[in-house]
């Protein structure tokens, strides 16, 4: 894997580093009235050095504070370079209360009272149980209050309130109920000029990422293999992407199991293995390891066209492990 990559121009590689995630991740939101707008513009601040200093930067296209490793430890208050996610949120995402990222204490449902809290990892207000009389950050008695305080401000342009009446049909918008981006209907104006802009901003709120165009984050901290579901070919394709991408899947298994089925793809069927250990060499797809492995078959006359059993390795690879044309080896 590689780190600190600009997708437009690959300029450096700094090794590998894995890090833990917050309980409630930063799912992103619009902040048009930012207190330090210039600091939040553009790419993560590029500087010289050989260090790997963890920090954060604000990604305007995703409207999200993202992890990044910088080559030096100088944090300039005027640059898109932050020591903590809280500092980034205060500077670039000030329209969303910081309480919306707090995880409140919970108790057993049978002993507590149901309240609503905003889960920024899921991008929605969920019901939890708290002790009777419990108050504090990110605890709301009603879901509508949670939506108004946290969800809608964080969704920003993806929120329903950004679709307004107008004289003609203009722009595109995010349909919260359908969880997809679409062209705005007649006499309504959407906040996005293109569907791609909408998906870039709102894809993090889509739970089933099976109809999202091929998108990649412009700036990468860690470059890794990712898996994108091609809704036309109905296959999970291997691509190069960021480890924290919100447009695709981290594993082929998750991609196949989310977007396809045993009836639709033989790649999801249990492997058709030979039982005698003799016969002609055949191939099957192991979805867990994402590999095409060998087996043997005596009953070569059987029709295996719809089974997880392939005559040639290339047939297995092309069917279950297709690579998008831009994929390069790490």
UniProtKB/Swiss-Prot annotation:
Output one GO BP term: envenomation resulting in negative regulation of voltage-gated potassium channel activity in another organism
Q: Which InterPro entries match?
A: Kunitz_BPTI (IPR002223), Kunitz_BPTI_sf (IPR036880), TFPI/VKTCI-like (IPR050098)
Its quaternary organisation is: Interacts with host coagulation factor X/F10 (inactive and activated).
What is the native source organism of this protein? Ixodes scapularis (Black-legged tick)
The cysteines covalently paired via disulfide bonds are: 40-92, 65-88, 100-150, 125-146, 158-202, 166-189, 181-198, 210-259, 220-242, 236-255, 267-320, 292-316
PANTHER family the record matches: BOOPHILIN-H2, KUNITZ-TYPE PROTEASE INHIBITOR-RELATED
Q: What is this protein called?
A: Penthalaris
Q: Which domain of life is it from?
A: Eukaryota
Q: Name one GO cellular component term.
A: extracellular region
Q: Cross-referenced Pfam families, in alphabetical order?
A: Kunitz_BPTI
Q: In which tissues is it expressed?
A: Saliva (at protein level). Salivary gland.
Kindly state which keywords UniProt assigns to this record, in alphabetical order: Disulfide bond, Glycoprotein, Protease inhibitor, Repeat, Secreted, Serine protease inhibitor, Signal
Localization per record: Secreted
Ranges for domain BPTI/Kunitz inhibitor come to: 40-92, 100-150, 158-202, 210-259, 267-320
In this protein, the residues bearing a glycan are 119, 147, 286
- So which residues are the signal peptide here? 1-22
């Amino acid at each position: 894997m590689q780190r600190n990559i600009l997708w437009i121009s690959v300029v450096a590689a700094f090794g590998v580093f894995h890090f833990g995630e917050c309980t409630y991740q930063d799912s992103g939101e619009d902040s048009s009235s930012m207190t330090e707008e210039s600091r939040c513009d553009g790419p993560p601040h590029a500087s010289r050095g050989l260090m790997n200093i963890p920090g954060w930067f604000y990604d305007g296209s995703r409207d999200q504070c993202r992890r990044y490793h910088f080559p030096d430890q100088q944090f300039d208050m005027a640059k898109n370079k932050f020591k903590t996610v809280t500092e980034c949120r205060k500077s670039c995402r000030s329209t969303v209360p910081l309480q919306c990222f707090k995880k409140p204490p919970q108790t057993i449902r049978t002993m507590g009272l149901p309240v609503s809290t905003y889960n920024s990892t899921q991008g929605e207000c969920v019901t939890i149980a708290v002790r009777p009389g419990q108050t504090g950050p990110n605890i709301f008695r009603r879901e509508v209050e949670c939506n108004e305080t946290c969800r809608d401000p964080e969704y920003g342009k993806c929120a329903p309130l950004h679709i307004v009446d107008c004289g003609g049909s203009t722009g595109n918008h995010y349909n919260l109920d359908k969880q997809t981006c679409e062209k705005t209907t007649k006499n309504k104006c959407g906040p996005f000029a293109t569907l791609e802009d909408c998906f870039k901003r709102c894809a993090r709120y889509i739970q089933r990422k099976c109809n999202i165009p091929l998108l990649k984050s412009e700036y990468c901290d860690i470059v890794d293999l990712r898996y994108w579901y091609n809704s036309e070919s109905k296959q999970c394709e291997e691509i190069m992407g960021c480890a924290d991408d919100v447009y695709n899947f981290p594993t082929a298994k998750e991609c196949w199991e989310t977007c396809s089925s045993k009836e639709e793809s033989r790649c999801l069927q249990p492997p058709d293995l030979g039982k005698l250990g003799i016969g002609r060499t055949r191939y099957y797809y192991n979805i867990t390891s994402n590999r095409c492995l060998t087996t043997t078959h005596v009953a070569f006359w059987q029709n295996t066209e719809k089974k997880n059993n392939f005559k040639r390795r290339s047939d297995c690879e092309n069917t279950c492990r297709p690579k998008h044309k831009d994929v390069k080896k790490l």
